[in-house]
């Protein structure tokens, strides 16, 4: 059987006057109607030969972007000066709604081959590679900058406040480009010391408060110790420091804060970080300061003349800045409600001392845990010192640990003495109330 004259249908005249080859369907009409695979032999497939069917290949309707022969400009020719009739001829061959000549005249030349280039802006390959190189751990830089890690601030909170401020200033395209990079910054590893210089000048700083998102015990100890000195900067005369009047705290706030602080210190002592003498020493200082706040809450200072007059009720500040030390525990002894107790009148001193005495068992439990940690450190220090002295011929008298065993023994003794003194004073207040 003779095949149909397909060549006449598949070689139409192009707009430029030259003939172009039009694409045929890969499957013939008979195989397409039967939903079977065609072997694509031209002019007649093997299936049509076996069945004696006419084999015809239709012109494909989904030709995509038709390449016009003879119209394509060389690479060196400038593209902005494309004629309007060429644009109209190119758009006429595209599948979709018909485009008139008037609309093509008023439309910029964006239908030619360079048109897909703006889409590539959404995923630039250079930016992610650049940020990946900066944020990836580098052995050469990590060793050089490891000494700066101890002074780094909270990077996760810094970039969490940094990312939204930058995202708000972007348009739609920039936000689509840089959103993955900013997301990587907000969750990047805080140990990367190179991130400390990435702060934007207009970024909002994290609010300064007593709480922090640091999760390691040493930082929690330092933050807790600063929390116990709320008026430390009241009398500071360092150049450039703006001192503020000291604040007073109620008995209720002292009791509640000390509960939280003692619970925090107990969790620190249960961690392996407490095997270090610095951490245990900081916990001991926290216990000393907590006992100071307890005894300040138990003492009756209602007889102090002018104490209530010097207190500013609107700002909760004490105007007697020069008369008291900024490191002294100052508790406001005024009628107040603590838990289910109402402290007022002649019952004030007795109820305050009774509340403090009922909380001292927490301190006793913490002092016992501190003593165990100090004893473990002393044993480890003595064993390391004995092994070092046996291995060296000349003894220079140096210590294997920063704090000697004698210092740790005195620290434990002072903790117990301070606890006994606060308990005795609180009991004395109860007896004379």
From Swiss-Prot:
It is found in: Nucleus. Residues 1-13 have a biased composition (Polar residues). Disruption phenotype: Imeairs expression of the sterigmatocystin cluster genes. It holds the Pfam family Zn_clus. InterPro entries: AflR, OAF3, Zn2-C6_fun-type_DNA-bd_sf, Zn2Cys6_DnaBD. PROSITE patterns: ZN2_CY6_FUNGAL_1, ZN2_CY6_FUNGAL_2. One of its GO terms (cellular component) is nucleus. GO terms for molecular function: DNA-binding transcription factor activity; DNA-binding transcription factor activity, RNA polymerase II-specific; sequence-specific DNA binding; zinc ion binding. Its main location: nucleus. Residues 1-23, 73-102, 378-404 are annotated as: Disordered. Signal peptide: none annotated. Residues 28-55 bind DNA. The keyword Transcription regulation applies. The keyword DNA damage does not apply. GO terms for biological process: aflatoxin biosynthetic process; asperthecin biosynthetic process; positive regulation of asperthecin biosynthetic process; positive regulation of DNA-templated transcription; positive regulation of secondary metabolite biosynthetic process; positive regulation of sterigmatocystin biosynthetic process; positive regulation of transcription by RNA polymerase II; sterigmatocystin biosynthetic process. Pathway: Mycotoxin biosynthesis; sterigmatocystin biosynthesis [regulation]. Keywords: DNA-binding, Metal-binding, Nucleus, Transcription, Transcription regulation, Zinc. Residues 76-101 have a biased composition (Low complexity). Transcription factor; part of the gene cluster that mediates the biosynthesis of sterigmatocystin (ST), a polyketide-derived furanocoumarin which is part of the most toxic and carcinogenic compounds among the known mycotoxins. Binds to the palindromic sequence 5'-TCG(N5)CGA-3'found in the promoter regions of several sterigmatocystin cluster genes to induce their expression. This is Sterigmatocystin biosynthesis regulatory protein. The lineage of its organism: Eukaryota, Fungi, Dikarya, Ascomycota, Pezizomycotina. The gene is aflR.
């Amino acid at each position: 059987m003779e095949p149909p004259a397909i060549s006449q249908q598949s070689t139409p005249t192009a707009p430029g006057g030259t003939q172009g080859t039009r694409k045929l369907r890969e499957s013939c009409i008979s195989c397409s109607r039967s939903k079977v695979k065609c072997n694509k032999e031209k002019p007649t497939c093997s299936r049509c030969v076996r069945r004696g069917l006419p084999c015809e290949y239709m012109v494909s309707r989904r030709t995509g972007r038709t390449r016009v022969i003879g119209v394509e400009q060389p690479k060196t020719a400038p593209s902005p000066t494309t004629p309007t009739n060429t644009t109209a001829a190119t758009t006429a061959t595209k599948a979709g709604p018909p485009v008139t000549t008037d609309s093509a005249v008023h439309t910029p030349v964006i239908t030619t081959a360079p048109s897909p280039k703006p889409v590539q802006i959404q995923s630039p390959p250079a930016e992610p590679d650049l940020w990946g190189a900066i944020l990836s751990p580098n052995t050469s830089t990590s060793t050089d900058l490891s000494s700066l890690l101890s002074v780094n601030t909270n990077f996760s909170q810094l970039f969490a406040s940094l990312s939204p401020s930058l995202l708000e200033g972007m348009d739609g395209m920039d936000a689509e480009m840089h959103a993955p990079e900013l997301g990587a910054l907000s969750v990047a590893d805080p140990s990367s010391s190179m991130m400390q210089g990435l702060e934007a000048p207009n970024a909002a700083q994290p609010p300064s408060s007593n709480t922090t998102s640091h999760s390691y015990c040493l930082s929690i100890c330092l933050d807790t110790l600063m929390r116990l000195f709320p008026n430390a900067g009241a009398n500071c005369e360092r150049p450039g420091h703006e001192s503020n009047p000291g604040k007073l705290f109620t008995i209720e706030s002292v009791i509640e804060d000390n509960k939280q602080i003692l619970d925090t210190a107990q969790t620190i002592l249960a961690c392996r970080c407490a095997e270090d003498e610095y951490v245990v020493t900081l916990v001991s200082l926290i216990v000393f300061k907590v006992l100071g706040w307890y005894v300040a809450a138990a003492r009756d200072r209602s007889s102090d003349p002018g104490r209530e007059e010097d207190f500013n009720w609107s700002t909760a500040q004490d105007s007697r800045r020069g008369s008291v030390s900024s490191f002294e525990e100052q508790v406001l002894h005024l009628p107040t409600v603590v838990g289910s107790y109402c402290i007022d009148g002649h019952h004030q001193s007795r109820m305050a001392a009774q509340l403090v005495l009922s909380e001292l068992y927490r301190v006793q439990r913490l002092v016992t845990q501190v003593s165990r940690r100090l004893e473990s450190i002393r044993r480890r220090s003595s064993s390391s010192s004995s092994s070092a002295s046996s291995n060296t011929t000349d003894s220079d008298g140096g210590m294997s640990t920063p704090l000697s065993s004698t210092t740790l023994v005195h620290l434990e003794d002072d903790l117990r003495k301070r606890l006994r003194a606060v308990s005795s004073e609180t009991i004395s207040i109860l007896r004379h109330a």
